[in-house]
Amino acid sequence: MKSGFVSIIGRPSTGKSTLLNSICGHQISITSSTPQTTRNKIKGIFTDKRGQIIFIDTPGFHLSKKNFNIALMNNVYSAIIETELIIYVIDIQDQPGTEENEILTIIQRSKINFIVVINKIDIHKTKEKEIMTFLEEKKIQKNKIIKISAEKQINIETMKDKIYENLNEGPLYYPKEYYTDQKINLRISEIIRGVTIKKLKEELPYSIYTEIEILEDRENKFFIKANIIVAGESQKGIIVGKGGKGIKSIGEESRKIISKILEKKCNLFLQVKLRKNWNKNAKLIKNLIN
């Protein structure tokens, strides 16, 4: 039996979280076209007769000196050193640039085994030629490269085979029925944040976070009171929407997803609260991301 920890890294919006969800067969990490939707290191667990793979989804790799981004990058670096194998995800639509150079430099310096995954091969307009040239120039062997579509489930089984080939014999670190080790309150919080980002598209991705104020398991259903926190007064109105339609829509969709994942009905009460300039508070950012 084989087992091991595998980090998933790459630039923002390359499909890392979609890949994690696709492999594990569950919605573990929230997905969005909005860059850097993932903030924490999210573990997804895949177990079959061959063994167990513990995936660590990471924030999108982005070079920036802002406090928020530095905290995100610290999560990426710590995930790399915790793993036996790195999956480096490249979006087939992206022209290789400075961040690709930096990511490969970090991987190669780490001396940790890695696989390069070129994602979204179902898309017609691509930079595949440029990507392959870039990887060739970096002396990446072809047997380390696999092309997939996480969304369309293309070559996912082949990718699992490739991962197992690169893992050592080891125990099951988690019971075989586990597909994540996330605590319930974090999962619920992330679901609400994911739905909010989806509804607002690109208006507020970095300016919100969610917190669970009350979480009680009451016989046949969960009772949840949660807050969506914004950094500026004007953002409250964007989330609440005209006549409260925005927050109502967020609540309804979040409730459906939470009930499905937890396999139990839930009463969800949402509020929008202002914590002015929270996204500039280094201590709070550290607590949120770690």
Swiss-Prot record:
Lyase in keyword set: no
Membrane topology (UniProt): Peripheral membrane protein
Localization, UniProt: Cytoplasm; Cell inner membrane
Domain KH type-2 residues, every copy: 200-276
Keyword vocabulary terms for this entry: Cell inner membrane, Cell membrane, Cytoplasm, GTP-binding, Membrane, Nucleotide-binding, Ribosome biogenesis, RNA-binding, rRNA-binding
GO molecular function: ATP hydrolysis activity; GTP binding; GTPase activity; ribosomal small subunit binding; small ribosomal subunit rRNA binding
PROSITE patterns linked: G_ERA, KH_TYPE_2
Gene3D superfamilies associated with the record: 3.30.300.20, P-loop containing nucleotide triphosphate hydrolases
GO cellular component, one term: plasma membrane
Region span, G4: 119-122
Domain Era-type G intervals: 2-169
Keyword Cell membrane listed: yes
Major localization listed first in the record, in broad terms: cytoplasm
Residues covered by region (G2): 36-40
Family, similarity comment: Belongs to the TRAFAC class TrmE-Era-EngA-EngB-Septin-like GTPase superfamily. Era GTPase family.
Task of the protein: An essential GTPase that binds both GDP and GTP, with rapid nucleotide exchange. Plays a role in 16S rRNA processing and 30S ribosomal subunit biogenesis and possibly also in cell cycle regulation and energy metabolism.
Name used for this protein in its record: GTPase Era
Originating organism: Borrelia duttonii (strain Ly)
Gene that produces this protein: era
